[in-house]
Regions:
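ABC-family P-loop ATPase nucleotide-binding domain
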Residues: 1-12, 223-236
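H-loop (His-switch) and adjacent beta-strand-loop-beta switch element
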Residues: 214-226
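ABC family nucleotide-binding domain
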Residues: 2-217
Length: 236
C-alpha cells in the first residue's frame, strides 16, 4: 500500500483575476518506507505539493491520501489533529524556540497528545534526541548549538510523535557541506533503520542522490523519474 497517494492534484491561485496553475493534474505514489526527493526549478510546484501532502495547504481539486487517511476530506480541526500525529516536519530553517532548551523544543509536538504525562513527554523527547545523537545536548539552548545540531534537534522534534511520514523542505539548504552530509546520513538512517517514509524537496543533486527515487517537476507536472532501486537491481 502506498504511504502517500496523490491523485489528479490541481492547485490554482488567483492573482489580479488571473489563474496561476501551480499543480496541474499531479499524480504521485510513495510506497511505505520509500525515500523520495522532489526536484525542479523555482516555481515548479515542489513546495506546494509537499504542503498539500502534509495538510498545510489544500488543493483546488484532487485527493491526497496519507497512511490510509484522505487528507483532503478532513475538516480544519480534524486536519490539525491529524497533522500533529501523522506528519513530521523538517524545514530549511530550524524554527526552534530560543528560550526553550533542546529537550523542551522536542517536547512541543507532544503537548497536543493529551494522553501523555509530563514524565512520558520528557522520556520520549530524550529518546528522540538520542536517536539524532544529541542526548548530551538536551539542556542546551539553541544559541549554544551549531547549525547542524539545531537541525538535528528539529529532526528529533519531527520524529518524536512517531509520524507516518516525514516531509522535509530543503533540510540542508542552510548548512555547510559537512553538516549537510551529517543530516543526510541521519535521514538515511531514519529511513533504513526506523522505516520512515520521507518526502524531501531539494535543489541539491547530492541530497537527492540519497533518495531511493528522484521525481522531477516542471510547471506543476512530473516530467521525469529516476529510481536508484531499479539501477541497483539492473547491475546485479
Amino acid at each position: 500500500m502506498a504511504s502517500v497517494d496523490v491523485q489528479n492534484l490541481r492547485k490554482i491561485y488567483k492573482r489580479d483575476s488571473q489563474d496561476i496553475i501551480v499543480l496541474d493534474g499531479m499524480n504521485l505514489q510513495v510506497p511505505d518506507g520509500e525515500f523520495v526527493a522532489l526536484m525542479g526549478p523555482s516555481g515548479s510546484g515542489k513546495t506546494t505539493l509537499l504542503n498539500c501532502i502534509a495538510g498545510i495547504d489544500r488543493p483546488t481539486s484532487g485527493t491526497v491520501t496519507v497512511g490510509g487517511s484522505d487528507v483532503t476530506s478532513l475538516s480544519e480541526g480534524a486536519l490539525a489533529k491529524w497533522r500533529s500525529r501523522h506528519v513530521g516536519f523538517i524545514f530549511q530553517f530550524y524554527n526552534l524556540i530560543p528560550v526553550l532548551t533542546a529537550v523542551e523544543n522536542v517536547e512541543l509536538p507532544l503537548l497536543l497528545l493529551t494522553n501523555l504525562s509530563k514524565k512520558q513527554r520528557r522520556e520520549r523527547a530524550l529518546t528522540a534526541l538520542g536517536v539524532v545523537g544529541l542526548a548530551d545536548r538536551a539542556k542546551h539552548y539553541p544559541r549554544q548549538l551549531s547549525g547542524g545540531q539545531e537541525q538535528r534537534v528539529a529532526i528529533a522534534r519531527a520524529i518524536v510523535t512517531d509520524p507516518d511520514v516525514l516531509v522535509a523542505d530543503e533540510p540542508t539548504g542552510d548548512l555547510d557541506a559537512k553538516s549537510a552530509e551529517d543530516i543526510l546520513n541521519l535521514m538515511e538512517t531514519l529511513n533504513r533503520e526506523f522505516k520512515k517514509t520521507i518526502v524531501m524537496v531539494t535543489h541539491d543533486p547530492r541530497a537527492a542522490a540519497r533518495a531511493h527515487v528522484e521525481r522531477h517537476l516542471e510547471k506543476g507536472v512530473l516530467t521525469a523519474s529516476v529510481s536508484r532501486r531499479e539501477a541497483v537491481v539492473g547491475t546485479v
